[in-house]
Amino acid sequence: MEQYHGTTIVSVRRGNQVALGGDGQVTLGNIVMKGTARKVRRIYNGKVLVGFAGSTADAFSLLDRFEAKLEKYQGNLTRAAVDLAKDWRSDRALRRLEAMLITADRETTLVITGNGDVLDPEGGIAAIGSGGAYAQSAAKALVENTELAPRDVVEKALTIAGELCIYTNTNFVIETLE
């Protein structure tokens, strides 16, 4: 059976603001199954943003576990992410999950990979998914050459990714924290 795949998630941090956005397309093989999926959410009483790419069921499983880790560590994003990554690497069932997460709170942005890596992106920009490289490139250019707010950078970066990546559409969900 073919896997559901394809999306673009991008995060931009500038000053005291962070924005995280994603498109809404879910693809099975060469068929668009849904165009309005919500892959970016607020969790932990609205204090943490999370976006996911990869297999939808796998991403929801990881999201549930990540929320539990945030509760365990009282909202400490880094400790929750590292503990989730440890579990991901050591648990046989979790190792088979095919998803990635970008998480952000007021101070920190982290990418959690399927290999169990926790990465703090350089320059305040992170992107994952099939259109991630397009979105990251666009966001980097916009951050370096404009004074746009993070939300505007995310929207423009997703628009560019949506124009270039066949697995990304232009139905965006964008969340911000200040």
From Swiss-Prot:
EC numbers, comma separated: 3.4.25.2
Gene Ontology molecular functions: metal ion binding; threonine-type endopeptidase activity
Chief location category: cytoplasm
Pfam families, per the entry: Proteasome (PF00227)
Binding site for Na(+): G162, C165, T168
Key words, A-Z: Allosteric enzyme, Cytoplasm, Hydrolase, Metal-binding, Protease, Sodium, Threonine protease
The reaction(s) this protein catalyses: ATP-dependent cleavage of peptide bonds with broad specificity
Activity regulation, free text: Allosterically activated by HslU binding.
Enzyme class (EC, first level): hydrolase
GO BP of this protein: proteolysis involved in protein catabolic process
Catalytic residues, chain numbering: T7
Subcellular location as annotated: Cytoplasm
SUPFAM superfamilies given in the database record: N-terminal nucleophile aminohydrolases (Ntn hydrolases) (SSF56235)
Recorded GO CC terms: HslUV protease complex; proteasome core complex
Similarity comment text for this entry: Belongs to the peptidase T1B family. HslV subfamily.
Function: Protease subunit of a proteasome-like degradation complex believed to be a general protein degrading machinery.
Database matches in HAMAP family: HslV
Self-association and partners: A double ring-shaped homohexamer of HslV is capped on each side by a ring-shaped HslU homohexamer. The assembly of the HslU/HslV complex is dependent on binding of ATP.
Name of this chain's protein: ATP-dependent protease subunit HslV
Source organism (scientific name): Cupriavidus pinatubonensis (strain JMP 134 / LMG 1197)
